[in-house]
Amino acid sequence: MSVLVYFSSSSENTHRFVKKLCIPAKRIPLIDKKEFQIKSPYILVIPSYNNGILDTAVPHQVTNFLNTLHNKFFLKGVIGSGNKNFGVNFCIAGNIISKKYKVPLLYKFELLGTNKDVINVKNGINKFWKKLNLEKKNQNA
């Protein structure tokens, strides 16, 4: 089964949102103790930090995680979290990851997300995996 992989700081905003989804998820550790590897396709849920300043918007833990070949290979999409106070840099980390790794930015939500965000993300994830599996089947035909 495909999973979500997410990073959440000690504020736990992203963690609380992911828990509301009731979808299997793995958390990128706050402290890089050892290499964290994913061995199946996943969607990354990533918050933006440092007021959306481009150089530091992607948490270093996420950068380290994506520098591992397996983790980079299995990344299929990204969901961004942020604060609308960042203005044009709202969810900028999601945009950065999407462009750098050439995966779709599937959704953006603010802070803890709303109930509507939870429903939209769950439905969007289901549609995304179905579409991805259909494309894969067509390529193998």
Curated annotation (Swiss-Prot):
InterPro entries: Flavoprotein-like_sf, RNR_Ib_NrdI_bac, RNR_NrdI. One of its GO terms (biological process) is protein modification process. It comes from the Bacteria. Pfam families: Flavodoxin_NdrI. Transmembrane segments: none annotated. Signal peptide: none annotated. SUPFAM superfamilies: Flavoproteins (SSF52218). GO terms for molecular function: FMN binding. Probably involved in ribonucleotide reductase function. Belongs to the NrdI family. This is Protein NrdI. It comes from Wigglesworthia glossinidia brevipalpis.
